[in-house]
C-alpha cells in the first residue's frame, strides 16, 4: 500500500477495520505521518494486534535511523562474541533479523490469545536492538554460579564441552578434579574423552567445526544438510529450515 497516494489511506483504514493483525517494519514515524498512530489504529479497530518491528523502537533517540542486521549485530555486542583472529565478525546467519522476527511472532501470538480472552487489542513495539542484545546474555538467573556449569577441555584433536551441574556441591567437586581432568584431556582425543565421561554419567560433547557438523551422520540422518547443484554444475552442502511439517 503506497501511502503517498491519498486514496490508499482509505484502503489501509478499511483493511485495519477487518484485520486481526497489522505488522509493519518501516522506520518509526512513517505510519504516524499519515495519521496512523498506534492510538488511532486501535481506535479504528480496538481488537487488532499491531506489531511494529524497527531497529531501535518507537521512542529511542535513534528511532528515526535505518537499521540493518550487521549494524545491529555490532551495536548489540554480538560481533564482539564472534571474533575471528581477534577481529569482530558478523555471524553467518542474520541473527538480529531472525530473532526480531521470531520475537515478533511470539509476541503477536500471545497478544492474540490475550485479545481472545479480553477483547482488547495490543500494540507491540519490538526493536531489533532489544532482540539482539537479549541473545548475548551468558547467565539465565540470579545465581552467580549459573554461568559456570560448563567447562571446555582442550584435547589432542580439539575441545570437549563438559556439564558439571548447576549446584554448588557439583561445582566444588569439579574444582577439586579440574586440574587432573585438564591434564588427562590433553593426552586424549575428543571421542575417547566423551565416551569415558558419559560412562561415568557426566554429560559431555565434542565441540565441532562447521565442516564436522556438515559431515556428522546425525546431521545427515535428520536431513538438515542436503546437496544442491549450482548452475555451473558444482555441488554445495546447504542447510534446510529445521521446521518440517
Give each language-model segment a name.
Residues 32-80:
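Rossmann-fold NAD(P)-binding glycine/threonine-rich loop
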Residues 5, 29-30, 55-56, 167, ...:
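Conserved beta-strand edge residues that scaffold enzyme active sites
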Amino acid at each position: 500500500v503506497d501511502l503517498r497516494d491519498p486514496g490508499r489511506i482509505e484502503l489501509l483504514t478499511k483493511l485495519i477495520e477487518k484485520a486481526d493483525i497489522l505488522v509493519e517494519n518501516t522506520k518509526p514515524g512513517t505510519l504516524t505521518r499519515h495519521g496512523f498512530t498506534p492510538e488511532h489504529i486501535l481506535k479504528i479497530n480496538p481488537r487488532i494486534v499491531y506489531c511494529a518491528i524497527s531497529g531501535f523502537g518507537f521512542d529511542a533517540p535513534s528511532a528515526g535511523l535505518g537499521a540493518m542486521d550487521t549494524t545491529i549485530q555490532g551495536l548489540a555486542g554480538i560481533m564482539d562474541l564472534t571474533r575471528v583472529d581477534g577481529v569482530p565478525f558478523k555471524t553467518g546467519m542474520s541473527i538480529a533479523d531472525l530473532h526480531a522476527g521470531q520475537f515478533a511472532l511470539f509476541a503477536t501470538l500471545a497478544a492474540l490469545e490475550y485479545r481472545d480472552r479480553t477483547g482488547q487489542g495490543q500494540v507491540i513495539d519490538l526493536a531489533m536492538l532489544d532482540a539482539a542484545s537479549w541473545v548475548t546474555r551468558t547467565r539465565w538467573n540470579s545465581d552467580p554460579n549459573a554461568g559456570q556449569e560448563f567447562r571446555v577441555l582442550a584435547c589432542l584433536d580439539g575441545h570437549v564441552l563438559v556439564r558439571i551441574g548447576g549446584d554448588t556441591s557439583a561445582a566444588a567437586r569439579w574444582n577439586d578434579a579440574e586440574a587432573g581432568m585438564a591434564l588427562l584431556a590433553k593426552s586424549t582425543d575428543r571421542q575417547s574423552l566423551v565416551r569415558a565421561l558419559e560412562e561415568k554419567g557426566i554429560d559431555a560433547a565434542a565441540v565441532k567445526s562447521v565442516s564436522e557438523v556438515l559431515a556428522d551422520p546425525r546431521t545427515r540422518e535428520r536431513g538438515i544438510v542436503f546437496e544442491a547443484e549450482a548452475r555451473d554444475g558444482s555441488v554445495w552442502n546447504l542447510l534446510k529450515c529445521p521446521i518440517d511439517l
